[in-house]
């Protein structure tokens, strides 16, 4: 609980409750070797029942994690396999000076580089918005492209990600705060 490195903390802290009723948070102060200087702050937090996830929150987190695993397995574009394919197909639109803090936009473009990795998709657009605000970002290089939220997320457990949008005419992406969104462009 609140240990930044619980690898060697043992089963007391790292136990798995397959019933989904408890996740171990608040079980006790983390080991002194790396954490004793923070115990005065950590102690009251660990005693606060409001900070312990409910069984419903644990189930929601599990379902959302399973959606991410399904996304990872949904297209071979997430496992290009060679340096050459990565260099050919992967770009980061909107990156660089002036890019919004806490945001990563990654485009895996299967129309580039000759070899068609996924016949079903022309591209995958991954947006990681770790900021506390909804991201609305024009990406001029994506004007005219037809990106839609992946069916896995559109039909998945996370209701927040469904507010993700892409405007084809302006190339503008909109992603809620603290959200990872995966958009796809079907093959033409």
Question: Which residues make up each language-model segment?
Answer:
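Loop/helix patches that line or flank the sugar-binding groove of alpha-linked glycan CAZymes
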Residues: 1-125, 130-145
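A structural detector for beta-sheet-dominated domains
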Residues: 109, 140, 150-152, 176
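Conserved active-site loop/cleft motifs that coordinate metal ions or position small ligands
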Residues: 125-128, 150-151, 182-184
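Solvent-exposed beta-hairpin/edge-strand motifs
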Residues: 142-158
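A short acidic, often aromatic-flanked loop/helix-cap motif at beta-alpha or helix-coil junctions
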Residues: 157-159, 180-181
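C-terminal beta-strand-rich structural cap/linker in extracellular carbohydrate-active enzymes
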Residues: 164-188
